[in-house]
Amino acid sequence: MEKENMQQIYSDEANSYDCIGCAIAKGELTPPGGTIYESRNIVLAADPEVPIPGFLIITGRRHVNSFSMLYKEEWMEIGEVISKAERAIKNLGLAQEITLVQEERSKHFHIWIFPTKDWMIEKFGRGVSCLRDISRYAMENATGSDWEEVEEAVREIRAEFYKGNYEY
């Protein structure tokens, strides 16, 4: 795929769905690099709109919008997946710290696993209040090579995710 077109293709495809979460959960939308982890409860993949290597989203398969609506099996699995994903991101040097975000205002339950990178701190500061500005900046300034980096990060995270035999 041509570098210039990757950004437009991912953005256009993601924006063509009423519910991006449902599209990912049903396999109708293929996130950059494909999925990292899938089960009957959740999907772990790169964000299909924001080209930041290591920015992952856990999407529930059921169409609920709140952590409190999840079954025990789902939130236990989510905890394990967050732990493995965070370790993979850090082991690969994609971030030294991450921020987890889950908002109920979204139509579909998802959790952001957002990597903190030096350029983000320098340009925007750190913390949850900066994430929208960082995301907007990444989308507005995205190039095809940014999406290629996201796809490469997904391949590396997937390998690290399954390689790690982490004790819980």
Each language-model region and where it sits:
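HIT superfamily nucleotide-processing domains
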Residues: 1-168
